[in-house]
Amino acid sequence: MPQKVRIALDAMGGDVGAAVVIPGAAIALSRHPDAEFLLFGDSAKIVPELDQHPRLKAVSRVIHTDVAVSMEDKPSQALRRGRKTSSMWLALEAVKKGEADVAVSAGNTGALVAMARFCLRMLEGIDRPALAAIWPTRRAKCVVLDLGATIGGDAHHLVALAAMGGALASVLFEKPRPTVGLLNIGVEEIKGHQEIREAGEMLRSMNLPQLDYIGFVEGDGIGKGEADVIVTEGFSGNIALKAAEGAVRQMMDLLRSAIKASWLAQIGYLLARGAFRVLREKIDPKNYNGSVVLGLNGIVVKSHGGSDAEGFARAVDVGYEMARFDLLTKINQTLNRDGGALAPAPVAQEAVS
């Protein structure tokens, strides 16, 4: 466990860049005073923001580059233009060199996954990365992966996701044997694609000591909190994520419209304002910002590109916790216990945007 948690930030990533990243880092520092920051990007944009946060400035070092990966770049374009020189690559390279414990970026998802895979390389036994995030549930929280790092995958890939997701959940939720379910169209063993059924059979027969496989989970089971970890391939996972985020926004819009519809409803809102505040905190996607890119020889966290300073700070919080509680070692231990079960998966397609 490091004395200080060294966090490399892609200060040019996201819709706004340094204007969100620097204030977000300042918020995160107020929660984690033992953090230090490496800020990669255009110093002309970083320094004025940094001057407004003296405490952050005292524990930060700016590494200048005027090359940034745009939100429109395809992964192949980002690698051609930004390899070795972009703020995103340099943040990842700091982790590779041991200068930072974790890299955080709000930049282009596909580019980040491709660069991270190319720069940090994959863990032994893992063929492709996965995006994992915390999801609010009726009971508490759960980890869902893959949320779109790659598309498709065979049974071995799903088993690898289960192993990595279990390690992540054990760190986040302090559970030595978190429950794991495979996302499927039904809970019966005959339901779903062949690779899902095979993965279920493998997980059940392996009976891994570090995770408790409970079987198939339907889409509504995520919100019910039926498992600590929900495993799916990236295409379905990304659709589930976007659908859930859209449902939350729709619900909040409908609620606001209903409150404004009559003076009686507005009085009711005033009386129940505290309960509404708790509800918003519980379901606001901003409060769950920060997806971990699993499967790499290093810790990388992806922040939502449109997040505000508080949202970006949440992503930094996730990276801090992953480094502080040594996620990489836990994943390696889990994979080593699995032995030969994690065979290479087919070549992955590009990340979902």
From Swiss-Prot:
Pathway assigned to this chain's UniProt record: Lipid metabolism; phospholipid metabolism
Disulfide bonds: none
Top class in the EC scheme: transferase
Chief location bin: cytoplasm
Pfam families, A to Z: FA_synthesis
The enzyme's E.C. designation: 2.3.1.274
Gene Ontology BP term (one): fatty acid biosynthetic process
Localization of this protein: Cytoplasm
Annotated catalysed reactions: a fatty acyl-[ACP] + phosphate = an acyl phosphate + holo-[ACP]
GO cellular component: cytoplasm
Gene Ontology MF, one: phosphate:acyl-[acyl carrier protein] acyltransferase activity
Keyword terms, alphabetized: Cytoplasm, Lipid biosynthesis, Lipid metabolism, Phospholipid biosynthesis, Phospholipid metabolism, Transferase
Similarity comment text for this entry: Belongs to the PlsX family.
Function: Catalyzes the reversible formation of acyl-phosphate (acyl-PO(4)) from acyl-[acyl-carrier-protein] (acyl-ACP). This enzyme utilizes acyl-ACP as fatty acyl donor, but not acyl-CoA.
Subunit structure: Homodimer. Probably interacts with PlsY.
The protein's name: Phosphate acyltransferase
Annotated source species: Bradyrhizobium sp. (strain BTAi1 / ATCC BAA-1182)
